[in-house]
Amino acid sequence: MGTELLLGNILNTNARYLSRELADLGITVQRESTIGDNQGRLADFVNEAKARCDLLVFTGGLGPTADDLTKETVAACYGDTLAFDEEEWAKITSYFARSGRETTPNNRKQAMVPVHGRKIVNHHGTAPGAWFEQDGRCAVLMPGVPSEMKAMWTESIRPLLLERQNCTLHSITLRVL
């Protein structure tokens, strides 16, 4: 997620990493898309994609700025709302204090978590992830910062997906000369 990816300002290494990780779980990646910071286009994309896919995986757009629209948009598309989480806010303010900075009012946005979905704790930054589910279809939201995304994937998302699987696909590559 993010206009900065569409402009070529940032290389999307998250897509490559997640494609490999999902394949390792036996989950077929049908499409990889980059959506700019536009709520209408994002909502259209989510509604279209969730109609044909069991799992949507998002990275980015969970920050405190006005153009970080992923969480509220996906929540609405999955029939959920967000609520302020005092525990998450305390974690965010503590994170800032440890780095010698103060929070600003826009940082409160990151303490908004799903009412019906699941908050995914971010142990390596200030943007919690989220898990939304509707009619057996899921959306997973992770931070766009690669190190935070990879940690959240390993610590939380991958285990959640493994719990949901009823089989495991193992693949090997044979090189024939």
Give a label for each model feature.
Residues R31-R41:
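Short beta->alpha junction loops
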Residues D44-R52:
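Short, well-structured alpha-helical segments in soluble
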Residues T3-E4, G61-P64, G144-S147:
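Short glycine-rich anion-binding loops that position phosphate/pyrophosphate groups of nucleotides
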Residues A51-C77:
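Glycine-rich phosphate-binding loop
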Residues R164-L177:
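Short glycine-/aliphatic-rich beta-strand segments at the starts of folded cytosolic domains
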Residues R41, D68-R164:
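Proline/glycine-rich low-complexity loops and linkers
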Residues M1-S33:
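Glycine-rich phosphate/diphosphate-binding loop of Rossmann-like nucleotide-binding domains
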